[in-house]
Amino acid sequence: MSNIPTELKYASSHEWIRKEEDGSYTVGITEHAQELLGDMVFVELPEVGDTVTAGEDCAVAESVKAASDIYAPISGEVIAVNEALEDSPELVNSSAYGEGWFFRVMPSDESEVDALLDAEGYQAVIDEE
């Protein structure tokens, strides 16, 4: 069973967000998603300054099994990307909720966070797959 931290919020498309002290949100993919994808070989991230829209694809995770679009859980401006993933995409596998984060976004509509799932809701999504 996948680890689903209770302090995070989740999208049904298997992304997570964590609120940071500056009001931004860190975005990554869940442990469940990286388990399904397998060993990461390449991650394509948005650019700092890009505007992302909730529910739209904004990054790509490529593994030995497949390439998968990564969707923005909330809308806003990308303020940072995890450049470590360029040389070490395997961080997504080894630390999905830590060093394997994808990007940070400053939300344009924080109410979108309320539409995301809590850990229990995300577990229900996994159980239905």
From Swiss-Prot:
Subunit structure: The glycine cleavage system is composed of four proteins: P, T, L and H.
Co-factor: note: Binds 1 lipoyl cofactor covalently.
Gene designation per UniProt: gcvH
Domain of life: Bacteria
Organism: Shewanella baltica (strain OS155 / ATCC BAA-1091)
GO cellular component terms listed in the entry, alphabetical order: cytosol; glycine cleavage complex
Name of this protein: Glycine cleavage system H protein
Nucleotidyltransferase recorded as keyword: no
Function: The glycine cleavage system catalyzes the degradation of glycine. The H protein shuttles the methylamine group of glycine from the P protein to the T protein.
